[in-house]
């Protein structure tokens, strides 16, 4: 539980910036300045320590009282025929307020991260998925397959907290865990085990990921693949990976939608999610979509909870009108 020491330090602080629920930070607050003392990383420190400079509302570049700024915005919304509310880098209460404002002003509401979010949302809406939680990963994973993502760049403490943790709830041998990258090569050594075991890397360009994932799924299903290579990867290497997935007791396929920045990436997400379902016919496997930085998941969940639809929804007709395209 978060608490403050006599020296003005805040202990066991949760990070709203990292996307993996780090809850062990020590921070110091001095006026408008926040400093991460312990357990920070590049993402968390940037979030907490970015200087707060502009704290006064402005209209046309001039500082004005808050009441005047609110009145100005209200008039703009009232006079607009097609207002848009965007950004949404906020918390739950901020997202609720933005949804209420969109409804009242008949605006379109969207998140700055919608392009990435829809790579997951469209799959969830179409065929569904089987996904797990960070706690389940920490306690159960024995094979982690990272698809098309350099997760240690965007989630620097993922391996420290979720994979190479000191112990698991079920007395698993942590060192026996396997990490495999498919697509992108990791930018650092976070995926290396405490005793020096390197991650296996099966590299290919993003453009080939849809084809590579399709072949991997076919191999998991026991289909015959006549090709010798796909996307520069030997099919025998993918066959070995398919067998590893089938032999694992609790594999986790992890991806970050923001990293899958190519046309129709949602079809690749769908393929890997369907592969997870295939694996569950004989063993246990789950997906893990990473995200949540800067309020993107919060905004989508609040929108779905309050309107029945995710972001990119229009209220101009007096009711929610969802159009992801």
For each feature predicted by the language model, list its residue ranges.
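Short amphipathic C-terminal alpha-helix that caps PH/PH-like domains
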Residues: 212-220, 271-272, 276
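Alpha-helical structural motif
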Residues: 69, 208-212, 237, 241, ...
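A charged, amphipathic alpha-helical module
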Residues: 221-266
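Glycine-rich, charged/polar anion/phosphate-binding loops
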Residues: 11-13, 236-241, 275
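N-terminal export/assembly segments and adjacent metallocofactor-ligating motifs
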Residues: 1-218, 257-258
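Acidic catalytic cores of enzymes that act on phosphate-bearing nucleotides/polynucleotides
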Residues: 264-325
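Extended, charge-rich low-complexity interaction segments
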Residues: 135-159, 227-234, 239, 306-325
């Amino acid at each position: 539980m978060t608490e403050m020491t006599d020296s003005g330090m805040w202990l066991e602080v949760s990070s709203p910036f990292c996307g993996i629920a780090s809850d062990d930070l020590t921070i110091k607050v001095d006026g408008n300045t926040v400093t991460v003392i312990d357990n920070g990383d590049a993402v968390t420190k940037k979030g907490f320590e970015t200087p707060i400079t502009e704290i006064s509302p402005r209209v046309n570049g001039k500082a004005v009282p808050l009441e005047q700024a609110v009145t100005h915005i209200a008039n703009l919304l009232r006079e607009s025929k097609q207002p848009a509310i965007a950004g949404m880098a906020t918390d739950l209460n901020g997202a609720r307020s933005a949804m209420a404002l969109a409804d009242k002003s008949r605006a379109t509401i969207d998140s700055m991260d919608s392009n990435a979010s829809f790579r997951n949302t469209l799959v969830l809406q179409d065929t569904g998925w089987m996904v797990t939680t960070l706690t389940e990963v920490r306690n159960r994973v024995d094979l982690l397959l990272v698809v098309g993502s350099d997760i240690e760049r965007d989630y620097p403490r993922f391996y420290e907290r979720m994979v190479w943790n000191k112990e698991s709830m079920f007395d698993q041998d942590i060192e026996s865990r396997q990490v495999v990258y498919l697509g992108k090569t990791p930018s650092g050594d976070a995926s290396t085990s405490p005793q020096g075991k390197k991650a296996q890397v099966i590299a290919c360009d993003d453009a080939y990921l849809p084809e590579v994932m399709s072949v991997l799924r076919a191999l998991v299903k026991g289909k015959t693949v006549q090709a010798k290579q796909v996307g520069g990867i030997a099919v025998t290497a993918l066959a070995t990976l398919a067998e590893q997935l089938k032999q694992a007791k609790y594999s986790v396929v992890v991806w970050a939608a923001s990293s899958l920045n190519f046309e129709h990436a949602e079809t690749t997400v769908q393929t890997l999610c369907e592969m997870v379902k295939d694996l569950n016919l004989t063993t246990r496997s789950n997906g893990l979509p990473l995200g949540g930085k800067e309020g993107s998941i919060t905004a989508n969940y609040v929108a779905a909870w309050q309107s029945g639809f995710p972001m990119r929804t229009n209220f101009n007709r007096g009711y929610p009108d969802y159009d992801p395209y």
